[in-house]
């Protein structure tokens, strides 16, 4: 059964589609109460509106910090329409109940992300908005609450259909509590960072499910992918292919991180989150792909390929002849994309360059490990900061190969040994329980190419 909308409170920061919503409410005979600039926008559009300060008899003060924090507002939001005592109490005080609350919050997360000052950020902490949202969500048996512009189409449908159903109001309330939880978490995290540069004493994160996956690492495991507060591989645009699997995502993330470690055109080929080959080449990603594939062509079959430059036809042609699970790059030439899309088995992702999250999380039984992300340009990573402690003086090409190997070995699971020549891996040993076996594995894969190569290890 739908509950009619007779009276609405509207106070929004984001004015997108405000006039459309106000017009629909007014046409349906809904009385609208509003605040400040929201009321002005509605009135300027010729939509009848009652200013909240006129209704409460209390003016907005302190630059708008206090405008809706008033018993006449919150009583109208919190009154249970099916509770005779509630209705008698507000009737005695000449307070009319609300059927609909439309609120969206000050953009706190966007403000701090823009580099705003501490004082500017403080002013973007919404107080009245969350209070009204939470009140309406608590009282969703009587009040429908709209907390985001993405819900406006649903609102318009409800206006035309005679109101919201109980199930719809419950879902809207659930969205509110998720929204305010994320809002408060952003504030708490920001204040904690402002207080200290150390790892936080308290840490939280809201994750939103992006999609369900067919299964997890194994067929008997359920799985889904969630997006957080930072962008990355989760936000990549899929241009072609079947839906991504759990293992596709883990390999794609590993490959993408591997190529972002390099400034020159780079390609990485991954299998089970380990590189089959990595290469950089000033001539472009086509040559880099060829060199990366030559490192271990057997393992590269069915792998995940990442490039840190636009994929052109010169790279697409050889890649299209080899079974590849996923290809990820910042962009694609039109002819290269057309060729690759003829392969039904390949998943093609377009991903914008993003800053790697400075914090890494790892679940453990009963808790979570948190550490700063292993950034490749940490102190000591640049060749200019190295000390040669033995052997003949190193020439420029050898130093270039060493820097490449050092940047590339970070993407190899420990114990890790990476052999390189001409800024391309020629043999990789990974995941062994002792470093000697990793070295043997790398040398065996390099074969005759091992002569004159350089080596990098992730430990002594």
Per-range role (PLM):
Residues 81-127, 134-136, 387, 393-396:
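Active-site/ligand-binding-proximal alpha/beta "capping" segment
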Residues 132, 139-151, 155:
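Mobile "lid/hinge" segments at catalytic clefts and subdomain interfaces of large enzymes
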Residues 1-55:
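N-terminal glycine-/serine-/threonine-rich phosphate-binding loop
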Residues 2-10, 15, 100-103, 183-185, ...:
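ATP-dependent carboxylate/acyl-activation modules
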Residues 19-26, 106-125, 131, 255-264, ...:
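Short, hydrophobic/aliphatic alpha-helical segments
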Residues 154-203:
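Non-catalytic interaction/clamp surfaces of large macromolecular machines
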Residues 30-33, 47-59, 101, 144-145, ...:
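Short hydrophobic/aromatic-enriched beta-strand-loop microsegments
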Residues 37-108:
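Glycine-rich nucleotide/cofactor/substrate-binding loop typically near the N-terminus or early
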